[in-house]
């Protein structure tokens, strides 16, 4: 049996709501419904009664619940034990490409400089979309996530690392937004709410990317503008703020599992300022 089906069943039974379960699992509501149907088909029973917004476990669902919890706990314990034997000196950090390029690469360098030679700690710098990294963190495939959005799941702990400033940049001085094409650099779903009020409603990006370096290199060729971190843009040089634009402050969070067996190491690593110079 697919453990993902059991995990989805447990989340729906906990929230009694397909939409909230989908949000907690970082899935679409249709994906949650599909998984529940798959599980019901495998077992040959209905697990939930659905009447408008009132979702309840059936008798079969109530009987399955303790077994599903035991199976998932056993599976998680097995994964943790196997992972521990092969990863005791490894530490994985996940973030988007733009965060690695603009600030985390320098932080990683400082971490290596501060490590004791005998520690033997091996870092893995993992680049992926936030949704994928959250799933990896939840499944103990990732130790630490650095992101611009606070966690939405109860089993996650987090620390606000600080804030950094974004400005709208182009490749030549004294340009206005109306004269430029928009290059969308992905800073997370919640950033799109701010973005909507800062660009024209009918503005269609000529390029969408998760890489700040790629966006920077395309500004001149595409006669474009993009939201870039101020300190990073100043270091790169050759960039100019768009004349009729504002600046935005973005938070940066470190997120990890509450019961992570690497909690003490996480605390030690976060003593080194991630936003040093930002």
From Swiss-Prot:
Gene3D superfamilies per record: Winged helix-like DNA-binding domain superfamily/Winged helix DNA-binding domain
Keyword tRNA processing: no
GO molecular function: DNA binding; DNA-binding transcription factor activity
A biological process term (GO) from this entry: negative regulation of DNA-templated transcription
Entry keyword set: DNA-binding, Repressor, Transcription, Transcription regulation
Name of this protein: HTH-type transcriptional regulator HdfR
Record domain HTH lysR-type: where: 1-58
Family in the record: Belongs to the LysR transcriptional regulatory family.
The UniProt record lists the keyword Repressor: yes
PROSITE patterns for the chain: HTH_LYSR
HAMAP family to which the protein is assigned, alphabetical: HTH_type_HdfR
Chain residues forming the annotated DNA-binding region: 18-37
Pfam families: HTH_1 (PF00126), LysR_substrate (PF03466)
Alphabetical list of PANTHER family matching this protein: HTH-TYPE TRANSCRIPTIONAL REGULATOR HDFR, TRANSCRIPTIONAL REGULATOR
